[in-house]
């Protein structure tokens, strides 16, 4: 178990790191070529706005208002009240809510984006709420993902990330963390398969350029937000 000081440091690092990643990556989101960052953006005005973080604050608000046993249906009610993003899976889920469909139907019905990254990118909250307890982190991640990714690879991506991030409070070896996290997603999922293949290529010692080409060959998708290619 980590002590309170370590816990605070890791949670703070998680939130700051998420802001850094979004601020650097946000301006080039959707570009498909290999990117080499040599200069950092001007952050004198603070980090860029980031829906990855905004939605986690909505979920945190749901927990504060409704208690820790919050369900997918209750999370979808929070979305209906506080979320107004029109794009991709968010927009389809919100349209379904306006039809009267709560989660998980809000995330499943007529939604072509269930396999995308909208839910994996908001997994950190469940890890920091349940550090060292991946089972509970995954359970909440699944409830969250059902709001806009029910039945899709996006749900498995959020579950994988929540497990890995929760265990990272006590484990520091990246390969070990990835292998352990894979136990929390279906073996026949594309997310799980893509990550296992990528581990194999990494351990064979080939270049990252080759690994990238293999990922795109086996799991590539014209939609840049498709989860398996991004997570791998």
Language-model segments: which ranges?
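Accessory "access/gating" subregions that flank catalytic or transport cores
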Residues: 2, 7, 11, 97, ...
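Active-site cavity-forming subdomains of large catalytic enzyme subunits
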Residues: 16, 47-50, 55-56, 60-151, ...
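An N-terminal structural lobe/cap that precedes and organizes the functional/catalytic core
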Residues: 1-58, 75
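Conserved phosphate/anionic-ligand binding catalytic regions in large, soluble enzymes, centered on
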Residues: 15-26, 115-122, 226-230
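Solvent-exposed, non-transmembrane amphipathic alpha-helical segments
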Residues: 31, 36, 40, 44, ...
């Amino acid at each position: 178990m980590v002590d309170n000081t370590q816990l605070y440091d890791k949670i703070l690092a998680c939130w700051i790191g998420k802001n850094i990643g979004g601020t650097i990556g946000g301006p080039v989101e959707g570009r498909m070529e290999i990117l080499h960052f040599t200069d950092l953006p001007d952050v004198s005005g603070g980090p860029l706005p980031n829906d990855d973080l905004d939605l986690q604050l909505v979920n945190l608000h749901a927990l504060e208002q409704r208690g820790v046993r919050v369900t997918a249906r209750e999370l979808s009610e929070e979305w209906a009240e506080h979320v107004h993003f029109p794009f991709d899976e968010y927009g389809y889920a919100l349209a379904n809510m306006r039809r009267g469909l709560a989660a998980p139907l809000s995330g499943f019905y007529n939604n072509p984006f269930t396999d995308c990254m909208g839910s994996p990118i908001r997994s950190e909250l469940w890890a920091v709420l349940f550090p060292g307890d991946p089972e509970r982190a995954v359970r909440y991640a699944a409830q969250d993902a059902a709001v806009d990714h029910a039945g899709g690879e996006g749900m498995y991506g959020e579950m994988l990330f929540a497990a890995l991030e929760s265990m990272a409070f006590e484990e520091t070896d990246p390969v070990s963390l990835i292998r352990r996290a894979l136990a929390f997603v279906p073996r026949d999922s594309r997310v799980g398969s893509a990550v296992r293949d990528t581990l194999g290529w990494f351990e064979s010692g080939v270049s990252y350029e080759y690994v990238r080409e293999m990922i795109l060959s086996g799991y590539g998708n014209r939609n840049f937000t498709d989860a398996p290619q991004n997570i791998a």
